[in-house]
A protein has these predicted regions:
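A short acidic, Gly/Pro-enriched loop at the edge of an enzyme's catalytic core
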Residues: 41-54
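A short glycine-rich, Lys/Arg-flanked "PGG" loop and its adjoining helix->strand segment in the class I
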Residues: 67-79
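C-terminal alpha-helical "lid/dimerization" subdomain adjacent to the S-adenosyl-L-methionine
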Residues: 86-142, 148
Length: 164
């Protein structure tokens, strides 16, 4: 994105310092270090604001406090900004999740996602098969007025979340 939109500025936040170091190196190799900034931070303590778009890329379900993270994101948006929420594809009911991809996601969620969330503050434990209805509830609790499905793939749902 930084290469395609050189007049824009991109920030990346992650609590894992080693991942931030790799991102910085890759930005340098791609020649986009001037319009990218990578900072070690949790989703609730970065101080930058005024964003047009904030993306949560397959991570909200792993967070102990996804409502708090989304609320912090809402406050960091400029007026009219939005959150792009990318999460594992899931139906809102169990019957809709009986397929090979969901089986894999349930297994990964049981072994990785849910324990990760439970080990953190709040420990909401959404898991990798939360579904659009539950994700929309989280975003509403965080102060978003609308959450609409912008796109989907066999593996992900992509939601556009707008502040109330």
């Amino acid at each position: 994105m930084a290469k395609e939109f050189p007049n824009s500025v991109f920030f990346g936040f992650d609590s894992h310092h080693e991942s931030i170091a790799i991102a910085r190196q890759r930005a340098k190799e791609a020649g986009v270090e001037d319009n990218t900034h990578f900072l070690t931070s949790t989703a609730k303590d970065y101080t930058e604001t005024g964003f047009d778009l904030i993306c949560f890329m397959d991570c909200l379900h792993d967070m102990g406090d996804p409502v708090g993270a989304a609320a912090h994101g809402r406050k960091a948006l400029k007026e009219g900004g939005s959150v792009l929420l990318v999460e594992p594809a899931a139906s809102d009911d169990l019957e809709g999740n009986i397929n090979p991809v969901s089986r894999l996601y349930y297994a990964a969620s049981t072994a990785v996602c849910t324990p990760c969330s439970l080990s953190q503050e709040v420990g909401l434990a959404l898991g990798a098969q939360a579904g659009q209805r539950r994700l929309s509830d989280v975003m509403r609790e965080a102060g978003f007025g609308s959450t609409t499905r912008a796109a989907e793939t066999p593996f992900n749902i992509i939601l556009d979340c707008r502040a109330a």
